[in-house]
Amino acid sequence: MKKMMTFLKKAKVKAFTLVEMLVVLLIISVLFLLFVPNLTKQKEAVNDKGKAAVVKVVESQAELYSLEKNEDASLRKLQADGRITEEQAKAYKEYHDKNGGANRKVND
């Protein structure tokens, strides 16, 4: 019996308790909840800036088209002429739909 007690004392292993593990998981989950919404906001901001850049490209291509052809440019004409892609036209429409289209210079 004495040998068994000494063996158990020697075999005692240091480890984390369940409460400590739960506290760590709680802290990690709180940090996760704080950072994820910020990441989605940043992604939206980057997408908006990218679409704003596309708007400038489309408008400059429309101006060049108008100068060369002496007629008003439209998104369809610019696409048919190969000056912009379908994705650029879509981004142009989405940008103006989201921001109220008051300053829209190129029609469909």
Swiss-Prot record:
Disulfide pattern: none
InterPro entries: Bac_GSPG_pilin, ComGC, N_methyl_site, Pilin-like
Expression induction or repression: Up-regulated by competence-stimulating peptide (CSP). Part of the putative comGA-comGB-comGC-comGD-comGE-comGF-comGG operon.
Subcellular location: Cell membrane; Cell surface; Fimbrium; Secreted
Region (May be involved in polymerization of ComGC): 14-39
Biological processes, Gene Ontology terms: establishment of competence for transformation; protein secretion by the type II secretion system
Protein name per Swiss-Prot or TrEMBL: Competence protein ComGC
Family: Belongs to the ComGC family.
Effect of residue 108 to C: Detectable but reduced rate of transformation
Encoding gene (name): comGC
Membrane-crossing segments per the record: 16-36
Phenotype when changing residue 20 to A/V: Despite normal expression level in cells, abolishes detection of ComGC in the mechanically-sheared fraction, probably corresponding to the pilus. Abolishes transformation
Record's subunit section: The transformation pili are flexible filaments, consisting mainly of the major pilin ComGC and smaller amounts of the minor pilins, including at least ComGD, ComGF and ComGG, and perhaps ComGE. Homodimer. Forms higher-order multimers. Interacts with ComGG; the interaction is probably direct.
PTM annotation (N-methylphenylalanine): residues: 16
Keywords assigned: Cell membrane, Competence, Fimbrium, Membrane, Methylation, Secreted, Signal, Transmembrane, Transmembrane helix
